[in-house]
Amino acid sequence: MTLRGPAALSRRGFLAGSAGLAAAGLLGGCASPTTASGATRVRIWSWLTGMDKYVAAFNAAQHEVAVELNVIASGLKGGYAQQTNALRAHNAPDILHAEYQGLPQLLTTGGLRDLTADLADLEPGCSPAAWQGVRPGGRTWAVPMDLAPMVLYYRKDLFDRHGIPVPRTWDEFRTAAQAVRAADAAARITTFPLNDGSFFAGMCWQAGDPWWRVDGGAWRVNVDGEGTLRTADYWQRMIADDLVAAVPTGDQGWIGAMHQGRLWGLLGAAWSVGTLGKSVPQDKNRWAVTTMPTWNGQPATGVQGGSAFAVSAESDVPAAAVRFLRWLSTDPAVAKIGTTFTTPFPGYLPSRAVAEKAYKGGYFLGDPVYGVLDEAARRVPDWTWGPNALGLFSTIADHLGGVKTGSTTLTAAVRQTQADAVANLRSRGLTVLEGTG
């Protein structure tokens, strides 16, 4: 599926979005641009698992550039606030960590280097979804590293034992959910975590109605579009009919339910491969993976995560920073290193082939993990993240909290989130339009 970047948004428009962003955290100190050995010093802040291994490998492979890593708190746990603060204070490192949904927030500071000319040759080799993710406003602001398309993981042994077909549509998924509960009254087909705004966004992404897009010089906000409301209504009925659990993915309640065989599936991203292997290692060769069920059989899937890296506009060593980021995104060594501690799904397609070849596998029945993820990545529809996406994740999670108790519904939560998103952008002095236009 071809992806198209949003219409060009003026730099002024993005900068205006900075008003009202929270900024807190420690600032990095200035450092000499060279080391004692004469290598060009490049400073990077990141929370990416394994970044220390990547940095060590790069530094060992050459001696002209010396990368120095400062591990910071993960994005919404302080990383974005720390980086936003540093950019505003003109004291940022050379390289900053940004997931695709977080890049517009960093861009609103005016502190990122435009990498359009530096990286133009990378586009043909990148997954369209990853490339779109680093081009808010139609310019390239970061180097994509990985992508996290969503898929369906399921207990193939239990589905087969009870004769439950693998669902290909959401109607079939509901039928399968009813069959799971009929087979085991304590079991559910999956959980729908009401505490995770990024999960809900990924599920709505599949429906093909972007929550933001650029319309001339304005931001058009469409959180309550038809696709999102259809998604909300579907899952509201699944929750109301007690066909899914509502425990947060990854917490102790979820792990306990998985250990006891009370959850037969997981709607998750590429990184969920590692989550399953670590959480329920005893279930090796019981799980399988397939593409997400679809609406009306039309192939599409959402994305939940993916990392990219930007360069500070005030870096004294931009060429050296870009050199490292090119290596991080495209060098085969990175994919090989990644497979020693995770299941990487690179945004750069040649690196993805290297990761697949190095993948040790063995957990999933049939183990077509990369084949399924590749197919999912090709199904990702157009999407644009707005400058208030990170705050919106928290907002929608707050509204979803009342769904479990029955004090609100998913549909009502979506409509309230739309109102909040519009009010937030207008409070920053931005021109905001609503609906599909």
Language model feature labels by segment:
Residues 160, 375-437:
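Conserved C-terminal helix/tail region of periplasmic/extracytoplasmic solute-binding proteins
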Residues 87-98, 186-187, 260-268:
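Alpha-to-beta junction loops
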Residues 272-283, 295-395, 432-437:
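C-terminal lobe and pocket-closing loops
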Residues 2-105, 123, 166, 247, ...:
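Conserved N-terminal structural module of periplasmic/extracytoplasmic solute-binding proteins
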Residues 100-150, 203, 288-290, 371:
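Hinge/lid segment of periplasmic solute-binding proteins
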Residues 177, 218-248, 292:
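Glycine-centered hinge/linker elements that transmit conformational signals in sensory
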Residues 93-94, 122-158, 188, 298-301, ...:
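A structural signal for short loop-to-beta-strand junctions that line the ligand-binding cleft
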Residues 139-145, 150, 174-221, 227, ...:
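Extracytoplasmic/periplasmic solute-binding protein
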